[in-house]
């Protein structure tokens, strides 16, 4: 909510930003705001377009029972992806009284993408002598429309101490995706040796809806005690139609495949929570409990629906001690839940190419994590230092399963899907520090080290035992009063996963910004991945087959942006955001 001096209006404000990058990337946006009396209006519009090359390999090596090479499949990928979209947001705040504010937030997104790739295959025998050569042509076109609206009201008796709020939010997402695949035989020299065959059209029509209703109440019980409580209802509905046609001979005779199917998924979560906070001298204490009752069901065409009901309790607690204004020690415990995402539940195959396919699992259960954390921080004249060791125990952990010997309709593929494993334990520490030397240098550094042990349980052979680490650096210097130089770097060491190993990842960004007309205008140049180090590589398989997959996603680019602002943009009440879900599937 906007906080203004009495009888002060911000009036009209606006802004414009635009930018482009090499190669073939462009974005532009504008915003307009108005505040007068009880009314606050703010709207934005943006358009972005991105065209980049994607190159990589998928090389497969098969072994005989004795462990000797049996055959090779080498795949080189040359692709290009084009993404573009329009974004619009509109926000209205209306002060009904000095203590009551009615707010509405609307967001619209229209997007489309075209993803094309040529994958060249070379088949070799055990001695790497030539056997066959062919090309798979893949073309994917996708369209999407997102509607999101939130209506809320807030009654404030004492800011941040005694408040009552309620919100209703609805999200609707429609996606249409069509993929065309062809196989073209080639001679050893790469020339065509015949007409294209094995044509395939995969069409997916998806509708996702989510309705959220919640109310939150905060009030002081005493001068040092505060109670927070609330209720939340969430409904999620997924509907997907998957239609597959095949032309095996390339003669125009398209036949519907048995892969065609329909999928419906419904989920409802009823939740309530209470948090009690108490201050005692230099200690701040907090204890909370959230209860959830959930039910869900999914249906596939021709199969009986499978319902699933569960209830959960999520206790939490925090003890914080401040021996001085410059130091703090905090101990915390919380129980968390991660529900499977939309793509993780989608059971229809999504082909990256003829050899690699992603398949979701609608039978996934949510995973639960008990997190214990200790945080110690110290702030001084020239910066701060924070050490945060942690331990996390997760049950029904959702992990990726890479199967290099899978088949889809008789075709040998490498499939990527998900399944629940029995448990996972991880422990490690985060070390973060900042250095402040005035305008000439402000720096930040972070280091993370952790070990994760995953046990698939008696029903699964999947397991992992890995140690990895990462660090990030950020430095900013004011070259002149109007020129700022900023650089950041990230590195993550290699890490083992179930049935595979991810190689290291590193990335650099450098930005030079120049202010014009005070703070009203600026121009910037950003170099993304200037050293071309952003590279993805994973090795996966078993004793019978090993696959190496590597990609460069065209991250490297030079961006030039211009920004202009007029007036003072009003502050608006944004919709409440859910806690971000942990992403434990891929490192």
What do these predicted regions represent?
Residues 54-70, 115-125, 130-132, 176-185, ...:
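Outer-membrane beta-barrel translocator domains and adjoining extracellular loop/strand segments
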Residues 1-118, 140-173, 216-232, 277, ...:
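Membrane-proximal, glycine/serine-rich, low-complexity loop/turn segments characteristic
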Residues 12-15, 69-76, 129-137, 148, ...:
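Extracytoplasmic loops and strand-loop junctions of Gram-negative outer membrane beta-barrel proteins
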Residues 454, 466-516, 539-540, 544:
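C-terminal beta-barrel architecture of Gram-negative outer-membrane proteins
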């Amino acid at each position: 909510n906007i906080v203004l001096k009495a009888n002060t209006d911000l009036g009209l404000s606006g802004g414009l930003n635009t930018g482009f990058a090499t190669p073939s990337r462009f974005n532009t946006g504008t915003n307009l705001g108005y505040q007068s009396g009880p009314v606050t209006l703010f709207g934005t519009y943006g358009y972005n377009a991105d065209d980049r090359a994607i190159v990589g390999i998928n090389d497969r090596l098969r072994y005989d029972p004795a462990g000797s090479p049996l055959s090779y499949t080498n795949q080189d990928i040359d692709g290009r992806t084009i993404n573009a979209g329009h974004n619009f947001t509109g926000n209205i705040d209306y002060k009904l009284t000095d203590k009551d504010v009615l707010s509405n937030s609307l967001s619209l997104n229209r997007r489309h993408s075209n993803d094309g790739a040529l994958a060249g295959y070379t088949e070799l025998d055990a001695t790497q002598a030539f056997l066959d050569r062919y090309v798979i042509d893949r073309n994917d076109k996708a369209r999407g429309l997102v509607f999101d609206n939130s209506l809320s009201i807030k009654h404030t008796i004492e800011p941040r101490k005694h408040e009552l709020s309620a919100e209703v939010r609805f999200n609707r997402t429609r996606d249409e995706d069509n993929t065309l695949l062809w196989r073209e035989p080639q001679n050893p020299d790469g020339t065509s040796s015949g007409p294209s065959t094995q044509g395939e059209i995969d069409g997916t029509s998806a509708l996702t809806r989510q309705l959220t209703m919640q109310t939150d109440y905060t009030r002081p019980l005493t001068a040092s005690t505060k109670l927070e409580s609330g209720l939340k209802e969430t409904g999620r509905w997924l509907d997907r139609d998957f239609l597959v046609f095949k032309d095996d001979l390339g003669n125009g005779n398209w036949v519907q495949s048995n892969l065609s199917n329909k999928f419906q998924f419904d989920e409802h979560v009823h939740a309530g929570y209470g948090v009690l906070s108490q201050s005692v001298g230099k200690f701040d204490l907090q204890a909370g409990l959230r209860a959830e009752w959930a039910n869900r069901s999914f249906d596939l065409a021709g199969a009986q629906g499978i319902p699933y009901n569960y209830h959960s309790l999520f206790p939490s607690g925090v003890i914080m001690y401040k021996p001085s204004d410059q130091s703090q020690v905090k101990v915390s415990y919380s129980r968390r839940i991660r529900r499977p995402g939309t793509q993780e539940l989608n059971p229809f195959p999504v082909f990256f190419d003829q050899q690699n396919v992603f398949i979701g699992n609608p039978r996934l259960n949510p995973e639960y994590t008990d997190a214990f954390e200790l945080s110690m921080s110290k702030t001084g004249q020239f910066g701060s230092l924070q050490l945060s060791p942690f331990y996390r125990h997760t049950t029904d952990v959702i992990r990726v399963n890479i199967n290099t010997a899978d088949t889809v309709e008789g075709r040998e593929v490498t499939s990527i899907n998900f399944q629940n494993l029995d448990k996972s334990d991880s422990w490690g520490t985060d070390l973060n520090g900042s250095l402040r030397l005035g305008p000439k240098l402000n720096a930040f550094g972070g280091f993370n080290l952790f070990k994760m042990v995953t046990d698939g349980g008696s029903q699964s052979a999947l397991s992992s035992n890995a140690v990895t680490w990462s660090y990030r650096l950020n430095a900013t210097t004011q070259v002149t009063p109007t020129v700022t130089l900023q650089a950041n770097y990230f590195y993550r060491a290699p890490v083992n996963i179930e049935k595979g190993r991810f190689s290291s990842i590193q990335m650099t960004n450098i930005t030079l910004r120049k202010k014009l007309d005070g703070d009203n205008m600026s121009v910037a140049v950003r170099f993304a991945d200037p050293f071309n180090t952003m590279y993805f590589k994973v090795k996966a398989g078993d004793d019978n087959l090993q696959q190496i997959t590597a990609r460069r996603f065209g991250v490297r680019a030079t961006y030039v942006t211009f920004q202009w602002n007029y007036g003072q943009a009003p502050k608006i009440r944004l919709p409440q955001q859910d806690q971000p879900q942990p992403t434990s599937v891929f490192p």
